[in-house]
Curated annotation (Swiss-Prot):
Reactions the enzyme catalyzes: carbamoyl phosphate + L-aspartate = N-carbamoyl-L-aspartate + phosphate + H(+)
HAMAP family, A to Z: Asp_carb_tr (MF_00001)
Residues the entry annotates as binding carbamoyl phosphate: 59-60, 109, 142, 145, 294-295
Name of the gene encoding the protein in the UniProt record: pyrB
EC number(s) per entry: 2.1.3.2
Gene Ontology annotations of biological process type: 'de novo' pyrimidine nucleobase biosynthetic process; 'de novo' UMP biosynthetic process; amino acid metabolic process
Protein name from the UniProt record: Aspartate carbamoyltransferase catalytic subunit
The keyword Transferase is annotated on this UniProt entry: yes
Gene Ontology CC terms: cytosol
Annotated metabolic or biological route of this protein: Pyrimidine metabolism; UMP biosynthesis via de novo pathway; (S)-dihydroorotate from bicarbonate: step 2/3
Amino acid sequence: MSGWHHRHILDLASFSRDDFASILELAQRFRSLPVTGVRKLPALQGRLVATLFFEPSTRTRSSFELAAKRLSADVMSFSPSSSSLSKGESVLDTARTYVAMGADVLVVRHRSTSVPQQLAADLDQLGERTVVLNGGDGLHSHPSQGLLDLLTLARYFDAQKPTPQALDGKKIVIVGDILHSRVARSNLWALTGCGADVVLCGPTSLLPEEFAAFVDAPPPGLSCDPVAQRGKVTVERRLEQALPGADAVMTLRLQKERMTQQLLTSLERYHRDYGLSHARLQLCGRQVPVLHPGPVNRGVEMTSQLLDDPTICLVEEQVRNGVPVRMALLYLMAAAESAAESSLVSISS
């Protein structure tokens, strides 16, 4: 892990294939710990991780907090409803309060785009050593979700050695509300960065044409790794055209809370055109895995029968992979490598 060079983790745009390989390797090692009987490592003992979630979360927050505890870190949780935000305190001042209490890592989620980036820049300008890990910001990015989806797919294609090479040349279909999805954006960086070809599928109202050029012409403020041989991104409007030849399918939640106007005729119409079912997946030509970042709207993004089928649906596997991936991120960001590596037990991946 000596080549790790990211101080903050704010998005995946600048991640190289070597970065993805480092995270997959470390996450796989952490994932194997229960098999050895080891439930906890002292790698981050004495470190303080603060989870500042200004937006509701079940999986991400719980997963980060469990990951920190598995590495023996102390954890502080922030709740907007019981904070000084209601008294007019700014997000930056709230974050600085936790920094003053000794937080080594701030895991930040906010409904507004670029809040974690601004916090990181402000803390750097102040000369603080605290690092910022983006737990999801607006429509921009959700790095840890993109990475756990990457691990889930890499393990599906090669359980013994989940590496970026396991994704090389694979066709991954992402279907649904891509316009409002930070998960889709992070998956685009992760999957194409590992050589997978991504097909985006959805109605025009939820999938603008410019997404086809997303990784070739990144939005302002994002620096894309220029070296990696990225997979390509294409847009399909009809699911029947997108599915043939797919190696995996990811469907996304309709984020009605982010829709400022009527973008869909009806949920029934959406399910008819873009909902996944066992029958519709037969268009892939073979059995393929289905992913969903959760929470799932049953009967909208996919049928209940498909969601409850563990032979195809990997939703619970995604949840299981969230903890080791976030352990890997916290380890890389907060631990002095020389000290932390000495605490790792030898685990064969």
